[in-house]
């Protein structure tokens, strides 16, 4: 374990004293450091009447138990403090470590000992080996009582709300859209978990089309075949118009108003970051949206109709929209329990809706936590004029996702009434996505949130993984960079895949979010500042660093070679079938120079930290009137790399007081032969830009530019890079087995590494 502490807020000695005393620690400004430390440690043993016995079972140094030390005249030293602090944090001498000084240094222990009460204050805010901070662990053991009121420590809310006595209620919010065109504004189901208190509370809202269930069997039937010819597109220019994001004024007329919801629930799937804050006085709201189980309308998949339907829930929390107690629309109900301040949460589609909601500029949305979210749907299903499936899902497209999330059809009565109209709508959508050409068009433009980034007012927190080939890093990169310069924004850029990071051992992400939520939603003047970019170092285990930005302008140019080289697109049928059946076998061969590709190896002559988009400038020609080029950059070398999927450690994370416990996780640091740094794909007809389609003349040289997926990746002098240039990518692109070649003039081609 390593300590990476970004959530601690430095305080004055007076504040440290006051906060320690308020929690029951009997420290004194006049007492010695040793006396205060003894009082602090004895308080730790909440379940012991005889704390002398507990102290005898801990050690102050390899020869002295802790009780004997406290009874002696010896002063408290940094070495004794460090060894006892390790035991307080759950580390076991002679098992987890033998040399405490070296162990503390190796773990980057964040506390510099000076004997002050600030040391004890920061120790409470430090994570234990189990993943909980020491103060959270003690509160879970009833250090302070459940009060159903806010208690803050170091600018963060503690778990003082009763999660056994929550309000669990359902309302149906009236949206400004009628997506199924039945003449009625669509209602969306809202599932609410909130503390049982008599004062207004803020809310964490998760907009998830998956929340009420999915229709996987129907979606699987629509999965597209990836085999086929790359189409020759007519040359031309694509024209677009800016989408309108306007909703009619809401009708706020009450109808037989009531103050209590009539529908309850026993269980719903939850997100543990929401659970963590629920125990700390922030309501949890889950909304599936239009076209889902027990809501109304059709699934419009990423357009602003879907977004405005989610926005209506925030409007309802602020008195700007109506909600009904049931879909019969007989009684309206207000959110009289809500303060109106909201943060959105969730990963993938959920993070996507966080991005989209932020661009509406809706009042009340104070903070957005967008984890691995899409910022432009074209960049999820397409790339540079090509069909490019999300990693791991070849053949998926927006129509299959629409079918997957249209859970309204899981209700047989709804199926009976609406399926015919829905299928007609789905056919229109399947045409509009234009799998034939792979081009950007008005349909995709209507689902591009980046163009409205200037409307964002909320504080934005992004998380994204360098190894996320599902929602690729371009999505966070372009949104992060498009936000107004004056806006407060933050990015946690890790080395994982398409994964949550709130349960990781190496970083205090959830505590950082606690501090930020208290500041933005509860109005707590805690002085908390979060760095702009927090990056997980790819070269070592559990190491995080602060950076100033994502994307730098400096570039290191690498000439690709001195000759020409060709890529054969065609494979023998047996190999083509094998790769199509198991794309991982294609990737294995590709990276080991066993597939149809140009493989170029380079040894770095300097240290470099890639930050941004690796750019390829290639002089190419195709033997036919079409073609595509794919590229991947890898670090080669048999050594340890961070694996992309977090491994569970132990079931030790407590999100309250024995509430929604979950497994602690971390990216394993494992031996491997290589690591993918970045990748990209381009239709040669889109070599100028996304909106320009040009002819490809057989055997005529062209200069193309290809920006690969953005990343942050550290390399040392002597490290080996491998650039692989190829055509068909069996994981991502159309699988065209035509017999043509793409030739690259390496002497006129280069790779630029941004730093």
Swiss-Prot record:
SMART domains xref list: PepX_C, PepX_N
Function: Removes N-terminal dipeptides sequentially from polypeptides having unsubstituted N-termini provided that the penultimate residue is proline.
Top-level EC class: hydrolase
Catalytic activity as recorded in UniProt: Hydrolyzes Xaa-Pro-|- bonds to release unblocked, N-terminal dipeptides from substrates including Ala-Pro-|-p-nitroanilide and (sequentially) Tyr-Pro-|-Phe-Pro-|-Gly-Pro-|-Ile
Record's subunit section: Homodimer.
A molecular function GO annotation: serine-type peptidase activity
Protein name, UniProt field: Xaa-Pro dipeptidyl-peptidase
InterPro entries: AB_hydrolase_fold (IPR029058), Galactose-bd-like_sf (IPR008979), Pept_S15_Xpro (IPR008252), PepX_N_dom (IPR015251), PepX_N_dom_sf (IPR036313), Xaa-Pro-like_dom (IPR000383), Xaa-Pro_dipept_C (IPR013736)
EC assignment: 3.4.14.11
Top-level lineage group: Bacteria
Catalytic residues identified in the record: 348, 468, 498
Pfam families given in the database record: Peptidase_S15, PepX_C, PepX_N
Gene transcribed to yield this protein: pepX
Key word Protease present: yes
């Amino acid at each position: 374990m390593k300590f990476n502490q970004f959530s601690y807020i430095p305080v004055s000695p007076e504040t440290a004293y006051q906060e320690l005393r308020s929690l029951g620690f009997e420290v004194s400004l006049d007492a010695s450091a040793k006396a205060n430390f003894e009082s602090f440690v004895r308080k730790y043993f909440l379940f012991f009447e005889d704390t002398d016995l507990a102290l005898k079972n801990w050690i102050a140094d390899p020869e002295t138990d802790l009780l004997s030390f406290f009874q002696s005249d010896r002063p408290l030293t940094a070495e004794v403090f460090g060894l006892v602090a390790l035991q307080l944090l759950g580390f076991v001498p002679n098992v987890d470590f033998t040399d405490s000084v070296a162990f503390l240094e190796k773990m980057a222990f964040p506390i510099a000992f000076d004997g002050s009460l600030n040391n004890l204050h920061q120790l409470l805010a430090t994570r234990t080996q189990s993943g909980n901070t020491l103060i959270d662990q003690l509160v879970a053991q009833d250090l302070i009582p459940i009060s159903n009121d806010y208690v803050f420590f170091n600018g963060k809310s503690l778990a003082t709300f009763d999660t056994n006595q929550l309000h669990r209620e359902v309302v149906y919010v009236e949206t400004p859209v009628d997506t199924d065109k039945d003449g009625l504004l669509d209602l969306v189901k809202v599932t609410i978990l909130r503390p049982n208190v008599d004062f207004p509370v803020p809310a964490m809202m998760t907009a998830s089309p998956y929340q009420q269930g999915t229709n996987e069997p129907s979606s699987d039937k629509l999965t597209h075949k990836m085999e086929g010819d790359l189409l020759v597109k007519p040359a031309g220019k694509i024209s677009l118009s800016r989408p309108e994001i306007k909703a009619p004024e809401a009708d706020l007329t009450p109808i037989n108003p009531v103050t209590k919801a009539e529908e309850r629930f026993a269980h719903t799937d939850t997100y543990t970051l929401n659970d963590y804050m629920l125990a700390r006085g922030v309501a949890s709201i889950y909304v599936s949206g239009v076209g889902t189980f027990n809501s109304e309308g059709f699934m419009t998949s990423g357009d602003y109709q879907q977004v405005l339907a989610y926005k209506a829930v925030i409007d309802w929390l602020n008195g700007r929209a109506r909600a009904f107690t049931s879909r019969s629309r007989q009684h309206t109900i207000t959110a009289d329990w809500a303060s109106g301040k909201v943060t959105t949460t969730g990963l993938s589609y959920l993070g996507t809706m966080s991005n989209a909601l932020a661009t509406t500029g809706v009042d009340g949305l104070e903070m957005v936590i967008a984890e691995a979210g899409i910022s432009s749907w074209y960049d999820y299903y397409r790339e540079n004029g090509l069909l490019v499936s999300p990693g791991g899902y070849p053949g998926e497209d927006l129509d299959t996702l629409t079918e997957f999330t249209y859970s309204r059809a899981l209700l047989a009565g709804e199926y009976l009434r609406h399926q015919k109209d829905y299928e007609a709508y789905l056919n229109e959508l399947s045409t509009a996505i234009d799998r034939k050409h792979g081009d950007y068009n008005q349909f995709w433009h209507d689902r591009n949130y980046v163009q409205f980034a200037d409307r964002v007012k909320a504080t934005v927190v992004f998380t994204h993984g360098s190894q996320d080939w599902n929602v690729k890093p371009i999505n966070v990169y372009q949104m992060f960079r498009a936000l107004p310069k004056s806006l407060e924004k933050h990015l946690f850029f890790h080395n994982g895949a398409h994964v949550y990071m709130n349960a990781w051992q190496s970083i205090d992400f959830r505590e950082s979010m606690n501090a930020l939520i208290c500041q933005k939603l509860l109005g707590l003047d805690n002085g908390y500042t979060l760095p702009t970019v927090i990056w997980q170092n790819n070269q070592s285990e559990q190491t995080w660093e602060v950076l100033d930005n994502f994307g730098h302008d400096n570039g290191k140019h690498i000439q690709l070679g001195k000759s020409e080289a060709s890529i054969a697109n065609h494979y023998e049928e047996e190999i083509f079938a094998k790769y199509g059946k198991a794309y991982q076998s294609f990737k294995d061969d590709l990276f080991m120079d066993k597939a149809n590709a140009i493989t170029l190896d380079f040894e770095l002559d300097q240290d470099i930290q890639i930050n941004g988009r690796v750019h390829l400038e290639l002089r190419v020609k195709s033997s036919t009137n079409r073609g595509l080029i794919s590229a991947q950059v890898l670090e080669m070398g048999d050594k340890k790399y961070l694996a992309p999927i977090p491994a569970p450690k132990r079931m030790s994370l407590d999100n309250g007081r024995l509430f929604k416990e979950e497994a602690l996780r971390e990216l394993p640091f494992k031996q491997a032969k290589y690591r993918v740094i970045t990748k990209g794909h381009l239709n040669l007809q889109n070599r100028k830009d996304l909106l320009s389609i040009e002819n490809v003349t057989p055997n005529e040289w062209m200069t193309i530019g290809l920006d690969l997926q953005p990343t942050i990746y550290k390399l040392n002098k002597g490290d080996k890079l491998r650039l692989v240039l190829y055509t068909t990518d069996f994981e991502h692109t159309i699988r065209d087995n035509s017999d043509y070649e793409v030739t690259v003039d390496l002497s006129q081609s280069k790779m630029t590494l941004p730093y």
